[in-house]
């Protein structure tokens, strides 16, 4: 079987939404060539576990690659992808060069080529993310391993927005907590919360593929009994009191459910937000404080910001 490799030259800001678009159109084997990864290896706080080849990366911007089966619908699928990407301009997302190209690859090339990009990565004090096909032995007794299949959906879980989210979970999740993951994607944050001791994790995503991916990855990590996954639009119709709510999505989406996050948090609970580009930081802060939240932590990585807010304890 022949496959078509679609390559999109864009910006770091556009990685997450374009990756989601590719998965929604049936693409497989997502690869992100981000030259900032080369800097992360040099400056890694926690120590990367692998080497990268600079020749694979663009000089500026990022390249997102994925694979589509070559069939009679390929042309329509590519046009659908281009149209969906251009729609991101509505959200004021910088698309950069926004160049789309196609090349033909054979199945045996496709089946192995993209795997060279994925190796175990230690992303916080306690958590290491590793692809399913890599053998990895923990280096300490308290190290927590999250296994992901990057070819299934939503990448590797090592994007700065995900790293910031997991570091937030590591700081604020306590054993026995109820955690909500809004916009769960691959389920990596839900898995992290469960491994950090959360008693229950409720994961929500509007995308059916994300729901399936979270369920599969939860089973892969043997924490599926703790993680309940539901197809849902943000927190619409949800009525529970969580200890922690985490959401790694666009700033414009976060501000749309700040009120629901407030309603579903216990007094003294934490709202961990990520996926926020620098120039949208104040937008999120303003909406959080207007609702009554207390912003207690701002964490940054490259152009991305994570904001942790607390619902004040009842007096």
UniProtKB/Swiss-Prot annotation:
Q: Which family does it belong to?
A: Belongs to the methyltransferase superfamily. PrmA family.
Which residue ranges does UniProt annotate as crossing the membrane? none
Xref: SUPFAM superfamilies: S-adenosyl-L-methionine-dependent methyltransferases
From which organism does this entry originate?
Oceanobacillus iheyensis (strain DSM 14371 / CIP 107618 / JCM 11309 / KCTC 3954 / HTE831)
Reaction equations catalysed: L-lysyl-[protein] + 3 S-adenosyl-L-methionine = N(6),N(6),N(6)-trimethyl-L-lysyl-[protein] + 3 S-adenosyl-L-homocysteine + 3 H(+)
UniProt subcellular location: Cytoplasm
Which coarse location class describes where this protein primarily resides?
cytoplasm
Which Pfam family, just one, is annotated for this protein?
Answer: PrmA
Q: Does the keyword Transferase apply?
A: yes
Q: Entry's InterPro entries?
A: Ribosomal_L11_MeTrfase_PrmA, Ribosomal_PrmA_MeTrfase, SAM-dependent_MTases_sf
Keywords attached to this entry: Cytoplasm, Methyltransferase, S-adenosyl-L-methionine, Transferase
Gene Ontology, cellular component aspect = cytoplasm
Q: Which GO terms describe its molecular function?
A: protein-lysine N-methyltransferase activity
BP terms from Gene Ontology: methylation
Report the top EC class in one word. Answer: transferase
EC number, UniProt record: 2.1.1.-
Name of the protein in its database record: Ribosomal protein L11 methyltransferase
What function is annotated for this protein? Methylates ribosomal protein L11.
Positions contributing to S-adenosyl-L-methionine binding:
162, 183, 205, 248
């Amino acid at each position: 079987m022949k496959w078509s490799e679609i390559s999109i030259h864009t910006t770091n800001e556009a990685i997450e939404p374009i990756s989601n678009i590719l998965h929604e159109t049936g693409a497989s084997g997502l690869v992100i060539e981000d030259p900032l990864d080369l800097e992360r290896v040099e400056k890694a706080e926690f120590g990367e576990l692998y080497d990268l080849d600079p020749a694979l990366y663009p000089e500026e911007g990022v390249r997102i690659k994925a694979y589509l089966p070559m069939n009679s619908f390929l042309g329509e699928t590519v046009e659908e992808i281009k149209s969906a990407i251009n729609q991101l301009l509505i959200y004021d997302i910088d698309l950069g060069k926004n160049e789309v190209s196609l090349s033909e690859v054979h199945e045996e090339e496709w089946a192995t080529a993209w795997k060279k990009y994925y190796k175990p990565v230690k992303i916080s004090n306690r958590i290491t993310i590793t692809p399913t096909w890599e053998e990895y032995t923990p280096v300490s007794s308290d190290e927590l391993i999250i296994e992901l299949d990057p070819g299934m959906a939503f990448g590797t879980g090592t994007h700065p927005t995900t790293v910031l989210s997991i570091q937030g979970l590591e700081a604020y999740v306590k054993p026995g907590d109820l955690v909500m993951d809004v916009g769960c994607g691959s389920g990596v944050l839900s898995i992290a919360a469960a491994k950090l001791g959360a008693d229950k994790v409720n994961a929500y995503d509007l995308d059916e593929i994300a729901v399936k991916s979270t369920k599969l990855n939860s089973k892969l990590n043997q924490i599926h009994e703790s993680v309940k996954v539901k197809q849902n639009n943000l927190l619409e119709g949800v009525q529970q009191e969580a200890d922690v709510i985490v959401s790694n999505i666009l700033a414009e989406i976060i501000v749309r459910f700040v009120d629901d996050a407030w309603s579903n948090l216990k007094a003294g609970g934490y709202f961990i937000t990520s996926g926020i580009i620098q120039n949208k930081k104040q937008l999120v802060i303003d909406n959080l404080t207007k609702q009554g939240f207390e912003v207690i932590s701002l964490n940054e990585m490259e152009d991305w910001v994570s904001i942790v807010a607390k619902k004040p304890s009842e007096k």
